[in-house]
């Protein structure tokens, strides 16, 4: 099967040496270092390993799983082993998603260079593969898995095993008939093109053929006019359909004569439907398409909570890898929890827990290196400063020396601003969000201060009433920084209000060290994002400025949305807000970010190390606009006079009816690859996330024993009150009557990026990785609800 990509795969001396194989040390920790024989397979797309050369090998990874290859010094683990192995002999393979990195140490610098250069060449090839090349690679991977004795050909017994691996339940007699038809050499085995023909016989699409014949006058081709009719009637392409039809024929018609005659064959039609142009996600939303010149507070900002953690909140590992992965997936606001460290060097970790420590300077170096690899729009450092004056000065030194010109240290024009700058204004800049020493003119009147104290006390009491068990040190109410008494008057009243209020039966925290005084040099680095305590919306309007930002626990934010959602919307129209998960989420679980986006909260911080529905929503929202990490909020969330209440939305919103016909599925993966004989019973669930009245879900019935090409043909109908805020999540599950249905794949996207018509939805894994070629085929139709229907 290696022939499928022959002539297209890059070939050089590095790859030839990799195909011969190399003994290298696989390193997991200081105590776990094992010699393994790694070899690039003949297909050029997979790497297998064995305990020794010639030993029984098993798959290690596919090139398509590799995100990048890093040199020795970029690995924390390899740096720690520098005395044992020369750094130049090591390298790190970084995978997409949440899969752990693979650290390897070669026997020589030359061998390490061979593998690094070869892998980088192959990763570049895979990144630029077209649709056909991706399918060829997928087929090659399956052939490798099915060819149990690795002789380059497949017997009927191996084909039967492969069918079960591919989720195909097929009558043995019919399968043998297809096998014999494909075996044109009559050798009793399938190889090369024969296997491809066998696969094609399995993947006939009668539902697409029926659709094709509906618009084709002769059932053989679509003329230009017939294709234009299809694009206008079904795909809702409007006036651009004529020009688009010519583009699509030129792009997807495999026959050169067909291109010249401006006709589309069945193969070309299917190619279009399976392509990005036939995807449910509108291709016009992929590039940067939104206005990026509005103030920062007008955007949703992709934000991370406890970015340094790659595990749970109590004993998990802290690593610069958390920052690298967050930034590379488009995150624009990262959290840095800084504490006094040994030898005068600040450290980053989750305070008062058993999580591991990392040097602050390593975190800053990683941020400086990766901040703008995915997006060149501004990165916000949300500093949680717990350091002494002396180590705060070290923080300032590392930030300024390592980040250099990337760090924003003064207002853009040198003048007092009247509103927050835009993402466009701040391209390539890193901003510090944190405490700032008060200026003389910012001091509050005693009456206002007393009112703030009372409101803060009420807020805290309400939070204790609703969550008496929430005693986590992550609570914002327990980590305030006292300002320098030499530069501003004491804040005794505020400190009293900010301390935990004791109640009968509640344990108090152990006594902590006196809180640190804020270093003026660190305060000076906070230019536009001064962190302030929230007391009430009235207090914020009367005493705060547009460049001040407040943080809210999820509990507090939910309470505010319920009690005064319209005021929260108005607040977020002129000031930035950050929402963070409850301290009770010690397992690094996530909340539903949608309810906070509904109120216009910009920085809804997520535990990005934890996959699941909540991260699917986050990835879905920020999939648009080039994945730059900034998404413009709807206009009614940018209006400081807005009357919109996320809990009770009313007109002038134009409600929409959404009609989804779930037609079929293609090449759905197994839930558990270890169960070769198990075949999934798939169903499709469509979930809507938006304002409370819009949040709902419906699902199809399940198809028994068919994950390869299930057919549903069922219609689901929804009524959406505020489509501007709606996210759609398509989930495929494996039905199980005895227990919870198992997850197979999902895809999430904003309503505003959804295309109508016949569309394929290309499924993603729990980690957000492509499950190509797994997809579901649907028909989407939206209709505006008439005033009569609404009344």
Swiss-Prot record:
Catalytic-site annotation from UniProt: 305, 350
Free-text comment about domains: The PDZ-binding motif mediates the interaction with GRIP1. The C2 domain mediates pre-localization to the membrane prior to Ca(2+) import and non-selective Ca(2+)-mediated targeting to various cellular membranes.
Keywords: Calcium, Cytoplasm, Endoplasmic reticulum, Hydrolase, Lipid degradation, Lipid metabolism, Membrane, Metal-binding, Nucleus, Repeat, Transducer
EC number: 3.1.4.11
Domain spans labelled PH: 16-124
Residues involved in substrate binding: 433, 435, 551, 578
InterPro entries: C2_dom (IPR000008), C2_domain_sf (IPR035892), EF-hand-dom_pair (IPR011992), EF_Hand_1_Ca_BS (IPR018247), EF_hand_dom (IPR002048), PH-like_dom_sf (IPR011993), PH_domain (IPR001849), PI-PLC_fam (IPR001192)
Domain annotation PI-PLC X-box: ranges: 290-435
Region called Substrate binding, residue ranges: 26-53
Extent of motif GBA: 213-243
Membrane topology: Peripheral membrane protein
Binding site for Ca(2+) 4: 679, 681, 705
Organism: Bos taurus
Catalytic activity: a 1,2-diacyl-sn-glycero-3-phospho-(1D-myo-inositol-4,5-bisphosphate) + H2O = 1D-myo-inositol 1,4,5-trisphosphate + a 1,2-diacyl-sn-glycerol + H(+); a 1,2-diacyl-sn-glycero-3-phospho-(1D-myo-inositol) + H2O = 1D-myo-inositol 1-phosphate + a 1,2-diacyl-sn-glycerol + H(+)
Protein name in UniProt: 1-phosphatidylinositol 4,5-bisphosphate phosphodiesterase delta-4
Domain EF-hand, first and last residues per copy: 134-169, 170-205, 207-237
Function: Hydrolyzes the phosphatidylinositol 4,5-bisphosphate (PIP2) to generate 2 second messenger molecules diacylglycerol (DAG) and inositol 1,4,5-trisphosphate (IP3). DAG mediates the activation of protein kinase C (PKC), while IP3 releases Ca(2+) from intracellular stores. Required for acrosome reaction in sperm during fertilization, probably by acting as an important enzyme for intracellular Ca(2+) mobilization in the zona pellucida-induced acrosome reaction. May play a role in cell growth. Modulates the liver regeneration in cooperation with nuclear PKC.
Domain PI-PLC Y-box intervals: 522-638
Positions contributing to Ca(2+) 2 binding: 183, 185, 187, 189, 194
SMART domains found in the cross-reference section: C2 (SM00239), EFh (SM00054), PH (SM00233), PLCXc (SM00148), PLCYc (SM00149)
UniProt cross-references to PANTHER family, sorted A to Z: 1-PHOSPHATIDYLINOSITOL 4,5-BISPHOSPHATE PHOSPHODIESTERASE DELTA-4 (PTHR10336:SF31), PHOSPHOINOSITIDE-SPECIFIC PHOSPHOLIPASE C FAMILY PROTEIN (PTHR10336)
Cofactor binding description: Binds 5 Ca(2+) ions per subunit. Two of the Ca(2+) ions are bound to the C2 domain.
Chief location category: membrane
Cofactor: Ca(2+)
Entry's Gene Ontology molecular function annotations: calcium ion binding; G-protein alpha-subunit binding; phosphatidylinositol-4,5-bisphosphate phospholipase C activity
Entry binding sites for Ca(2+) 5: 734-736
